[in-house]
Amino acid sequence: MTDKLATLQSALEKALGNRIQSLTEAVGEITLVVKAADYLETMRTLRDDATLKFEQLIDLCGVDYSAYGDGAWNGPRFAAVSHLLSVTHNWRVRVRVFAPDDDLPVVASVVDVWNAADWFEREAFDLYGLVFEGHPDLRRILTDYGFIGHPFRKDFPVSGYVEMRYDPVQRRVIYQPVTIEPREITPRVIREDQYGGLKH
C-alpha cells in the first residue's frame, strides 16, 4: 500500500469509525463496505469531512452477486457500488452497500448528496431492480415502457420474455412472447489437413 493510500485509509477509519464493515485495498484503490442503515450518513461524511472531501460522484452502479466468483456466493445478492473522487486531495474511493433484502432490494438514495447520482440510480433501478429510497423520480431510463423484469439480473433469460416485430397485417410494431428454436450458437468448424499451409 502506498503512503497516499495509507493516509486515506487512516482518514477513513478516523472519520467513519464503526460504520465501516470492511475496508480493503486492491489495484491501487480502497474499497469501503458499509451497512445499508449507515449508507446515507456515511456518504454525507465522505463529502463533508475536511480530511476526506469527496466532492464528486464519478459513477454509481448496481451489481448482482448471485453468481459471483465460482457461483457459491453466500452473502446478500444486490449491491450499489459508488466511485467517489476528491479533487482537493486527489484520491478515490469505492463504496459498496448491500441491500439487506434480496426479494425487494432497497438502499437510500444519494441524490441529495450528489445530484449526479440521479440517472445512475435510475439505471441501477431499471437494470437490477434496486430501489433507491428517497429518489425524486425513480423510473426506468433504458428499457421500453411496460418492460417486465430487470435485464441485468443473473436470473433474467438472455432472450428476454417478449420480442418486438413488425406486423404487416396490422402495419405496426407488435410485441409477442419470445419464440426461440434450439440452435448451435458456435458452429463446429472442421478444417482440412493442409489449411493455410500448416501441417498438423
From Swiss-Prot:
InterPro entries: NADH_DH_suC, NADH_quin_OxRdtase_su_C/D-like, NADH_UbQ_OxRdtase_30kDa_su, NADH_UbQ_OxRdtase_CS. It is a peripheral membrane protein. Gene3D superfamilies: NADH:ubiquinone oxidoreductase, 30kDa subunit. It is an enzyme of class 7 (translocase). PROSITE patterns: COMPLEX1_30K. One of its GO terms (molecular function) is NADH dehydrogenase (ubiquinone) activity. It catalyses: a quinone + NADH + 5 H(+)(in) = a quinol + NAD(+) + 4 H(+)(out). SUPFAM superfamilies: Nqo5-like. One of its GO terms (cellular component) is plasma membrane. It is found in: Cell inner membrane. The keyword NAD applies. Its EC number is 7.1.1.-. Keywords: Cell inner membrane, Cell membrane, Membrane, NAD, Quinone, Translocase, Transport, Ubiquinone. Belongs to the complex I 30 kDa subunit family. NDH-1 shuttles electrons from NADH, via FMN and iron-sulfur (Fe-S) centers, to quinones in the respiratory chain. The immediate electron acceptor for the enzyme in this species is believed to be ubiquinone. Couples the redox reaction to proton translocation (for every two electrons transferred, four hydrogen ions are translocated across the cytoplasmic membrane), and thus conserves the redox energy in a proton gradient. NDH-1 is composed of 14 different subunits. Subunits NuoB, C, D, E, F, and G constitute the peripheral sector of the complex. NCBIfam families: NuoC_fam, PRK06074.1-1. This is NADH-quinone oxidoreductase subunit C. It comes from Ralstonia nicotianae (strain ATCC BAA-1114 / GMI1000).
